[in-house]
């Protein structure tokens, strides 16, 4: 018995030495493609950092992030948690039928931030309506999959009340048309309208919302059943997979929709990104070989993306979209209607939106955000003034 104990101790010490040695010898990684985030760097060793505790915290984060074979350990940990029937893993919920869900609890909701964001949009709409017809200003909140696909959630999942906040925010919006897409999405909850391993909606979910928005604004749209589906990849694992790192996770498909000529909407436009880069499509096929394949839509998020669509039904209409990443799958459809579209992402744009609208002769405005992003966003104040 004593011999076995000694052997186990030797094996354990050797294992620790191997992991520690490997971690020291291996070059630090700056970015984890699997987790889709930058990893911690060594903390600065200063007296102030030691006394404040920043050095100790930074060292803990650094050692955790740079441990040898980190991705493998996380995968093993996830496997053990799943074997123990744990559905709360890495800040996400493991649901039914291969669906994972973003975990945003009631405690994560900042009521004061919501009030600030609502006020910013209210003020923006009031100002925009001085130059744009109110009927051409619209507001669209996208529900997260946890609301639309609640039947796929694991038992005892705690999520903030999306319906309550969508109702509350929509009722406060004036000087605009409010497009509520919940009923349309809920009626298709058995369809593939949200990715299983990512927090975004699929192109089908986005198109259903686009149809609803067109109905609300008086624009034309082609029935979904009449469109041609074109699959770009069947090997997508998104943001929720990056949190959980489950080796058994499903792969998602990414696709576009087009007309009977097999041409995807948004694939034959002229784009200018951040006033510099030029391209001729809303789709970046190079991203399909990368980890974050959702970047297939526009290549990434940018401060401004200007789109010119020569085949649009209304060449005299110029749409401004204030957006988060959920708009990236939505906007290509709008190229069928608007001769010009500009997307502004306030996370990366520091200009004056009012001046931009005047300079570019904007005729229509859409504010499109996912509800989770809207209630937590800290950049919407940019709508009503300079930085």
Question: Where do the language-model regions lie?
Answer:
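Extracellular glycan-modifying ectodomains
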Residues: 1-387
């Amino acid at each position: 018995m004593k011999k076995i104990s000694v052997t186990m101790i030797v094996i354990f010490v050797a294992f620790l030495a191997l992991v520690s040695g490997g971690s020291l010898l291996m070059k630090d990684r700056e970015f984890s493609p699997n987790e889709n985030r930058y990893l911690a760097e060594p903390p600065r060793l200063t007296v102030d950092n030691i006394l404040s505790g920043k050095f100790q915290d930074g060292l803990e984060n650094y050692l955790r992030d740079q441990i040898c074979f980190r991705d493998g350990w996380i995968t093993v940990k996830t496997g053990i948690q799943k074997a123990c029937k744990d559905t709360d893993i890495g800040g996400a919920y493991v649901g039914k039928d291969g669906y994972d869900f973003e975990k945003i609890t009631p405690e994560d909701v900042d009521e004061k931030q919501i009030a600030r964001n609502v006020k910013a949009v209210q003020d923006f709409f009031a100002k925009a309506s001085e130059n744009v017809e109110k009927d051409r200003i619209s507001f669209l909140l996208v529900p997260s999959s946890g609301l639309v696909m609640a039947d796929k959630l694991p038992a005892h999942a705690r999520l903030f009340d999306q319906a309550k906040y969508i109702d509350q925010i929509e009722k406060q919006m004036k000087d605009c048309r409010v497009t509520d897409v919940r009923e349309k999405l809920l009626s298709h909850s058995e369809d593939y309208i949200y990715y299983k391993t990512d927090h975004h909606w699929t192109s089908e979910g986005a198109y259903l919302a686009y149809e609803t928005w067109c109905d609300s604004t008086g624009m034309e749209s082609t029935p979904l059943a009449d469109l041609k589906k074109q699959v770009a990849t069947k090997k997508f694992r998104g943001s929720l997979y990056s949190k959980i790192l489950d080796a058994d996770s499903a792969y998602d498909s990414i696709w576009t929709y087009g007309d009977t000529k097999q041409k995807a909407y948004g694939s034959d436009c002229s784009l200018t990104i951040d006033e510099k880069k030029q391209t001729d499509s809303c789709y970046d096929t190079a991203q399909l070989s990368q980890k974050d394949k959702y970047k297939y839509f526009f290549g990434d998020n940018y401060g401004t993306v200007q789109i010119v669509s020569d085949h649009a039904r209304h060449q005299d209409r110029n749409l401004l979209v204030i957006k988060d990443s959920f708009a990236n799958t939505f906007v290509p459809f709008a190229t069928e209607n608007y001769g010009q579209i500009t997307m502004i992402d306030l996370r990366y744009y520091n200009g004056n939106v009012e001046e931009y609208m005047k300079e570019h002769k904007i005729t229509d405005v859409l504010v499109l955000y996912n509800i989770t992003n809207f209630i937590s966003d800290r950049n919407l104040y940019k709508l009503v003034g300079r930085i």
